[in-house]
């Protein structure tokens, strides 16, 4: 009897101290963050870069891409290095990261249907970047 009470007491203490083990953890959305290093070509302008970037994001990650919850474009605003250009794409789940990326590829081919059109867009757009970038994937912190 004494052993049974001790085990029962230990179980009650364990359960009361660790009540989160029985609750499912809340899962927030997933954020894919890409930090591009900007280039400043002599034959370019902020206006053209903004126009091309907006066009690309709207066509590939906008309303037609059902896996994307939201997207943001962030430009370095203050400090010593103004080369940071950050793209943030929000999706609901880890699986949606791949699905959103695949869909954006399909939408890119719809928006620029020929190889010549794709090359022309890529040449115009890519001149604004050095080719250096980093990719990170974050999950939203949600209270349990």
Task: Go through each PLM region and give its residues.
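Bacterial Sec-dependent N-terminal signal peptides
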Residues: 1-27
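Short S/T/G/P-rich N-terminal loop/turn motif that feeds into the first structured element of a domain
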Residues: 20-84, 90-109, 122-144
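Residue-level signal for alpha-helical context at structural boundaries
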Residues: 67, 115-118
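Charged, solvent-exposed helices and adjacent loops that form client-binding or oligomerization surfaces
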Residues: 109-115
């Amino acid at each position: 009897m004494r052993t049974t009470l001790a085990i029962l007491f230990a179980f009650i203490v364990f359960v009361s101290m660790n009540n989160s083990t029985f609750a499912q953890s809340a899962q927030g959305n997933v954020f894919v963050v890409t930090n591009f290093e900007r280039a400043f070509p002599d034959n370019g302008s902020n206006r053209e870069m903004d126009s091309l970037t907006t066009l690309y994001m709207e066509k590939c990650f906008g309303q037609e891409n059902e896996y994307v919850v939201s997207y943001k474009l962030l430009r370095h605003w203050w400090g010593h290095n103004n080369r940071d250009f950050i793209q943030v794409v929000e999706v609901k789940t880890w699986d949606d990261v791949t699905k959103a990326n695949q869909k954006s590829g399909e939408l890119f081919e719809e928006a620029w249907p020929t190889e010549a059109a794709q090359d022309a867009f890529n040449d115009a757009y890519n001149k604004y970047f050095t080719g250096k970038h980093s990719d990170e994937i974050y999950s939203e912190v949600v209270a349990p």
